[in-house]
Design a protein with these regions (language model features):
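Activation corresponds to long, low-complexity, non-globular regions
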Residues: 1-63, 162, 168-172
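Beta-strand-rich ligand-recognition modules
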Residues: 21, 56-84, 92-172
Length: 172
């Protein structure tokens, strides 16, 4: 039996300040939440309950929630802190179908493309994120978001869906 001795040094480059602050959330199963956020969805819309699991360590824990699937677009209003340095929008969704892609608009300005390539028909819940730059969020307390699904490849169906959103502001 041979014993090995390991030495190491760990450097932590962190800040004592909070850098992300949660400012809002939208629950697709709550009519009150949808109304408060002025949530609208267009196109072919299907609303269904999904019971499945997330990938990862707790991949045997079932979660049940409502999912909005659509081919048109969705829009909603979120609350942010005016002195933010950008916003992170986190979506909870069903990843059964691959290549979920949508163009994101913030107050009528193009914020870029949100793309989720992965799929998992067995562990269907996933959370993914979209970063909204400070140039579109600074000095605002409310953002009007528009999500317009698009197809990544010719002949591929549009496959965007939403179960919940969480909003985080980058702060100094």
């Amino acid at each position: 039996n041979q014993y090995l001795e390991h030495l190491g040094i760990v450097f932590y480059y962190g800040q004592d300040k909070v850098s992300l602050v949660k400012t809002d959330s939208i629950d697709m199963a709550s009519k009150k939440s949808l109304k408060r956020h002025k949530y609208k969805v267009e196109g072919d819309v299907s609303v269904e309950m999904l019971t499945s699991c997330f990938e990862g360590d707790a991949d045997d824990v079932e979660v049940t929630a409502m999912v909005h699937k659509f081919t048109g677009e969705s829009s909603f209003r979120i609350t942010v802190l005016p002195n933010n340095h950008g916003v992170r929008l986190r979506r909870c969704s069903d990843q059964e179908l691959p290549r979920q892609c949508a163009r994101v608009w913030v107050d009528g300005q193009d914020a870029g493309v949100w793309y989720l390539a992965d799929s998992n028909p067995y562990k269907r819940w996933i959370e993914d994120e979209f970063e909204i730059p400070e140039s579109l969020t600074r000095d605002k307390s409310v953002l009007n978001i528009r999500i317009v699904p698009e197809s990544r490849e010719e002949g591929c169906p549009v496959s965007w869906n939403e179960s919940a959103y969480e909003v985080f502001c980058y702060m100094e």
